[in-house]
Amino acid sequence: MVIGLSTGSDDDDVEVIGGVDPRLIAVQENDSDESSLTDLVEQPAKVMRIGTMIKQLLEEVRAAPLDEASRNRLRDIHATSIRELEDGLAPELREELDRLTLPFNEDAVPSDAELRIAQAQLVGWLEGLFHGIQTALFAQQMAARAQLQQMRQGALPPGVGKSGQHGHGTGQYL
């Protein structure tokens, strides 16, 4: 028997014949990988605060030329920010961040371009992390919604009363 089910979303008008939406299968298969991504950020509020600060610093570096003292200060802020970020991350993400970020030469003052590149790289990595977390959370939400809908559909078929007798279905009949 073939059953037509609506996916419940009014904006895409998709009807699945056969009972299971292939989009939900993909969500369920990837759920274990994506849920682990949300566990990799141990202190999300701290990571968000530092990420926002780093992004603001990048905008400042782009906006005005920096003198030697400000470039030294920004180099120190960059190194401190990375250490603080690592405190809020699980070991897997710490290792990835360590591989991607190269320390500045302590003997020389970094140029404006070096600082911009380092800050942009860090901002890009953080934005990728945030997008990955958002995607994982969305996938979890979709999987939970699909599971709830399956539970609702299995509860009582339309037109069946409490005692198992067929009653009137819902809706208007002409």
UniProtKB/Swiss-Prot annotation:
Residues 161-174 have a biased composition (Gly residues). Interacts with the core proteasome alpha-subunit (PrcA) through its C-terminal hydrophobic-tyrosine-X motif (HbYX motif). Interaction of Bpa with the proteasome stimulates proteasomal peptidase and casein degradation activity, which suggests Bpa could play a role in the removal of non-native or damaged proteins by influencing the conformation of the proteasome complex upon interaction. Can inhibit degradation of Pup-tagged substrates in vitro by competing with Mpa for association with the proteasome. One of its GO terms (cellular component) is plasma membrane. The gene is bpa. One of its GO terms (biological process) is positive regulation of proteasomal protein catabolic process. Belongs to the Bpa family. Forms a homooligomeric, either hexameric or heptameric, ring-like structure which stacks co-axially with the proteasomal alpha-rings. GO terms for molecular function: proteasome binding. Residues 153-174 are annotated as: Disordered. InterPro entries: Proteasome_act (IPR019695). A motif (HbYX motif) lies at residues 172-174. It comes from Mycobacterium tuberculosis (strain ATCC 25618 / H37Rv). Keywords: Proteasome. This is Bacterial proteasome activator.
